[in-house]
């Protein structure tokens, strides 16, 4: 008997297989690109979604469901999120005999019993699959599952050690060995989260540490350790731990001075004061094809696009140019934070910044994540329901703060970045 298969059915099967293949990992790096299992080049255009605050649950769920937050991100063309966490989340799991904290405890400890109870009820109303006994990592898992459904990549970012707003030179989280930045706990936390997130198909990268910076109130630590040699030493420790737990993860390495430059890591210069040079062989088994660099830029009051381009290039994007004679090691480089106020005088001051980035990032095909998706936080800097003037979303997360910015600058920036 001869089986007849209609052309329409055959086409639908092909489309179904193509969709099912997303994200088509494992991923690796080839020169300046991240590529999937087919060798297709992957670019990321996304937003930061913080989860490193005192509650240690990703923000905004008192206003929207996980599905709606990600649908809004997807609606303007974005294909990625930078999902942040605090090392303290893992510290608490170890202190609790390996058991994660439930949402009831997380919100009450983060916001106080009265307000925590009120906010939790709003979260549960918007996300009815959760209960008060749902754990924090189960929320992260739900975000990862929805990212898979909506084809949104995840960069999992260790943002801070002590769960709170970041960053400053006196916050105790500046540098390895600072008062709240225990090195062993950091290595353990990165490894734990790598093992946990290994099951997330949408995870494409894992960032080792957000914004290493000078400990301005800790002179002894600054004088002893705030240098490129120690950054390189600690990044190798963290990368080894993440790779051991999740060999498929692409690992993101940051630089000094709030991660505003990574030049010594790709230029071949000696890392001071030790004199060693970045060597992929130091990252045994993965240094050739699992490393990415990241930088941040907040020069949003500048009036010269050429100056901004120059700084972005010479502080990081240069590493993507294999023809540049000053580049010893070629890497993909991601701009994992940039941003500005969304309204008022501060937004107007940033006109050169937003227009320049909207043109330049697609031009260099750099992956990027804007800071930040948030409207109101659960709490920030001691203020509950803090409304972030830099946030893309309105205070109640119901829409965009600045539709003109989205339409005129951000959407073209997204489309240009992701254009094949």
Segments the model singles out, each with a brief description of its role:
Residues 16-82, 93-115:
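N-terminal carbohydrate-binding accessory modules
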Residues 1-20:
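Fungal secretory targeting signals
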């Amino acid at each position: 008997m001869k089986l007849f298969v209609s052309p329409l059915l055959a086409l639908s099967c092909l489309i179904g297989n193509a969709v099912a293949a997303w994200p088509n990992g494992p991923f690796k790096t080839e020169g300046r690109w991240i590529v999937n299992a087919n060798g297709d080049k992957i670019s990321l255009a996304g937003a930061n979604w913080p989860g490193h605050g005192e509650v240690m649950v990703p923000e905004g769920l008192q206003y929207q469901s996980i599905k709606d937050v990600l649908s809004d991100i997807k609606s303007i063309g974005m294909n990625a999120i930078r999902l942040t966490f605090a090392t303290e989340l893992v510290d608490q799991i170890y202190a609790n005999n390996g058991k994660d904290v439930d949402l009831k405890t997380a919100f009450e400890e983060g916001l106080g019993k009265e307000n925590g109870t009120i906010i939790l009820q709003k979260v549960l109303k918007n996300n009815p699959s959760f209960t008060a006994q749902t754990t924090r990592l189960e929320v992260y898992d739900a975000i990862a599952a929805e990212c898979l459904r909506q084809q949104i990549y995840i960069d999992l970012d260790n943002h801070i050690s002590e769960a709170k707003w970041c960053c400053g030179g006196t916050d105790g989280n500046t540098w390895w060995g600072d008062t709240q930045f225990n090195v062993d706990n950091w290595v353990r936390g990165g490894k734990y989260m790598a093992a946990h997130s290994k099951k997330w198909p949408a995870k494409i990268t894992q960032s080792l540490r957000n914004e290493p910076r000078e400990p301005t109130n800790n002179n002894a630590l600054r004088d002893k350790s705030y240098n490129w040699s120690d950054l390189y030493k600690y990044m190798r420790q963290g990368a080894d731990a993440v790779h051991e737990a999740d060999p498929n993860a692409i690992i993101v390495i940051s630089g000094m001075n709030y991660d505003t430059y990574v030049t010594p890591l790709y230029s071949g210069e000696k890392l001071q004061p030790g004199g060693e040079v970045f060597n992929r062989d130091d990252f045994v088994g993965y240094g050739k094809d699992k490393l990415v660099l990241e930088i941040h830029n907040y020069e949003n009051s500048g009036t010269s696009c050429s100056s901004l381009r120059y700084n972005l290039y010479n502080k990081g994007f240069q590493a993507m140019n294999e023809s540049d004679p000053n580049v010893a090691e070629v890497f993909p480089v991601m701009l994992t934070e940039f941003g500005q106020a969304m309204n008022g005088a501060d937004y107007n001051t940033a006109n050169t910044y937003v227009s320049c980035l909207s043109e330049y990032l697609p031009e260099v095909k750099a992956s990027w994540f804007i800071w930040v998706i948030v409207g109101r936080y659960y709490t920030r800097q001691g203020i509950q329901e803090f409304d972030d003037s830099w946030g893309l979303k309105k205070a109640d997360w119901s829409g965009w703060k600045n539709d003109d910015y989205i339409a005129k600058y951000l959407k073209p920036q997204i489309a240009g970045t992701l254009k094949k």
